Amino acid sequence: MALFSHSFAEDIAAASTDTCPALGDLVVIIDNRGKTPPLTIETFDYPIIDVGALKGTGRIIDFNNCTKFVNQSTYKSWFRSGHPKPWDILISTVGSLAEMKIFLGSKGCVAQNVVALRATSISPLYLYQYLRLIRSDLVAYNIGSVQPSIKVTHIVKHPIFVPERSRLEAFEKIAKVLTNQLYDNYNENELLKKLRDALLPRLMSGEINASTIGL
């Protein structure tokens, strides 16, 4: 995001890491790693957000990239650390390291290889952009010899430059409007896809006469 670079890049580059708080002081971690939840072969409203769903340049999660699901009972009872909430930052810890996205919506699960960072005393959108900026530093925590992996206990010690509250609030206000617009566009596109999928077979079968549709 150009706004982030324009507003903070110079200050971040000049900041002394000795005076910066650690990431772990600024977030609560939602961590359900350790074992795999019972999955369903059906597509439910409760997707597992894995590493594949965090790849790409977009800021928000595209749930079309989720391929695993749990049922309602598992969603409500299995996940010991809870579920992501809006504006949490989801980050991968195994495989393709430090892939990250912002969680928006109401249903989604994190289990193996992904944790959620919930900002408590910092703008979540500032923190997201900051983590994107230092992604190479996070990847450098890799301890895996066969499969790349990073420990959460390592990355939470990474220093984070925190600007004045007034600057954070000004950035958050603009960034949240832009991000909400992206999410609205995503939801509108999903609605149009569902409408297309519902109408196209009826058009092809002749059940609906295209000549009577006012387009």
Where are these regions (language model features)?
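Short, small-residue-rich loop/turn micro-motifs
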Residues: G52-K55, V94, H154, E164, ...
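Short, hydrophobic secondary-structure boundary micro-motifs
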Residues: A140, S211-T212
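A short beta-sheet element
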Residues: D50-V51, K68-R135, V139-V146, K151-T153
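Non-catalytic DNA-recognition/assembly elements of restriction-modification systems
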Residues: M1-P38, D45, F161, R165-S211
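Sequence-specific dsDNA recognition surfaces
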Residues: G24-I41, G52-P86
